From Swiss-Prot:
GO molecular function: 7S RNA binding; ATP hydrolysis activity; GTP binding; GTPase activity
Subunit structure: Part of the signal recognition particle protein translocation system, which is composed of SRP and FtsY. Archaeal SRP consists of a 7S RNA molecule of 300 nucleotides and two protein subunits: SRP54 and SRP19.
Keyword Cytoplasm included in the entry's annotation: yes
Main location: cytoplasm
Keyword Ubl conjugation: no
Identification of the protein by name: Signal recognition particle 54 kDa protein
Gene this protein is translated from: srp54
Organism of provenance: Methanococcus maripaludis (strain C6 / ATCC BAA-1332)
Length: 450
């Protein structure tokens, strides 16, 4: 998994950060660790060694710029070279809100294309545009049903042929007519292989029919550096591929290899799939991506994610907190907001110092604890939620029985509530909680067993 890559790279860089003296021998040792981490993530050996030479040359020959120590300069060199490995610049999906856009999704069967179609629709929806979906894959029996379920979940119109008696070209033609009121049409085409000439000819016909603004190739991140061959084959067959969407990065040990391989052939990666949910699609930003992997965090993305899921009740809760009111009702609302943000590992990776070295078990424990805390609060009366100080021995035992937990776990929740309340109290007084202080205490209590 990519968190394993992040952990290995962070451990390598920590040798620099924790060293009393940085010499050529230490630089070479750290570079060997970086090489091992990247090769284990299936990054091409030649790319790794070329990058290593550049890191070594700059680390030994370059003087640190003003304001940076030697250690900081070497860490920055590694960061810059890793970013370069993944393509450096952000490739944005450009859509003109004043006219209808068409996106054609292509890729090999099993790459996650149908799920990606729904994720892309959700992404566009969050940008304030109205997406529509066309299910043009008549070859895979479950394709229409899968896209139907996903489209209903995100409230996006779908056109397709459940009977699978029409051709993909006819379905697309009818769908273009039916979806006149949407801003962006996303077409999920049949999965294919480069040797299937008939399917490639059909795709060309669909391309001519729809005149798409963008053709997005969906590639399975678990392929590792083999993704290069697949991307190149499609690029040669369909010369107008606009961009790449790499899926399944959350569960692949070869994700780094897939990303670097695609970047190597200058095929712009615009999106990455980071989980199974419809909201788990991100615009690919090499700098933010490497920053999160190395444990430097990505506060911009964290804020964006928070804004995306903030509803009226969450905003009311924050208003109450800022006015000095923080009961278990406000805590419950905050836990609900965190739950909607996605996998805990992903959220914590956006917080500086939390991502690169955090064990997977700790993230899982955090997620489990959040769920259990909510179950415990569901067993409380409204009076108890508004006045947690009322929860003494008899009430505590009743709540524990109702939630199916031990009384000690209710005490753990109340301790967490107290810590969080104090932190918010300081925030209200203009003091920013530090990761090593109260904020660290909050995160540690969630992440580790007592």
């Amino acid at each position: 998994m990519l968190d394993k890559l992040g952990q290995n790279l962070s451990e390598a860089l920590n040798k620099i950060k924790n060293a009393t003296f940085v010499d050529k021998k230490l630089v070479k040792e750290v570079i060997k660790d970086i090489q091992k981490a990247l090769i284990q993530s299936d990054v091409n050996v030649k790319l790794v060694f070329n990058m290593s030479k550049e890191i070594e040359r700059k680390a030994i020959e370059e003087a640190p710029p003003k304001g940076l120590s030697k250690k900081e300069h070497i860490v920055k060199i590694v960061y810059d070279e890793l970013v370069k490995l993944l393509g450096e610049t952000i490739q944005k999906l450009e859509l003109d809100a004043s006219k209808k856009s068409v996106i054609l999704l292509i890729g090999i069967q099993g790459s996650g294309k149908t799920t990606s179609a729904a994720k892309l629709a959700r992404y566009i929806q969050k940008k304030g545009l109205r997406p529509g979906l066309i299910a043009a894959d008549v070859y895979r029996p479950a394709a229409y049903q899968q896209l139907k379920q996903l489209s209903e979940k995100i409230n996006v119109p779908l056109f397709g042929d459940e009977t699978r008696t029409k051709t993909p070209v006819d379905i697309t033609k009818e769908g273009m007519e039916k979806l006149k009121k949407v801003d962006v049409i996303i077409i999920d085409t049949a999965g294919r292989h480069k040797e299937e000439e008939g399917l490639l000819a059909e795709m060309k016909e669909m391309k001519d029919l729809t005149n798409p603004n963008e053709i997005i190739l969906v590639i399975d991140g678990t392929l590792g550096q083999q993704a290069k061959n697949q991307a190149k084959a499609f690029k040669d067959s369909v010369s107008e591929i606009g961009s790449i969407l790499v899926t399944k990065l959350d569960g692949s040990a070869k994700g780094g290899g897939a990303l670097s391989a695609v970047a190597e052939i200058n095929a712009p990666i615009k999106f990455i799939g980071t989980g199974e949910g419809v909201d788990n699609l991100e615009q690919f930003d090499p700098k933010k991506f490497i920053s999160r992997i190395l444990g430097f965090g990505d506060l911009d993305s964290l804020l964006e994610k928070t804004e995306d899921i903030m509803d009226e009740s969450a905003e009311e809760s924050i208003d109450s907190i800022l006015k000095g009111k923080f009961t278990l009702i406000e805590l419950y609302a905050q836990l609900e907001t965190i739950s909607k943000m996605g996998p805990m590992k992903q959220i914590l990776s956006m917080i500086p110092g939390m991502g690169g070295n955090m064990p997977k078990e700790a993230a899982q424990l955090t997620e489990d604890k959040l769920k259990r805390y909510k179950i415990m609060m569901d067993s409380m009366t409204m009076e108890e939620k508004e006045n947690p100080e009322l929860i003494k021995t008899s009430r505590l035992q009743r709540i524990a029985r109702g939630a199916g937990v031990k009384p000690e776990e209710i005490k753990d929740l109340l301790k967490y509530y107290s810590t969080t309340k104090n932190a918010f109290g300081n925030l209200k007084r203009g003091k920013m909680p530090k990761m090593g202080g109260q904020m660290g205490q909050i995160m540690r209590q969630l992440m580790y067993k007592d």
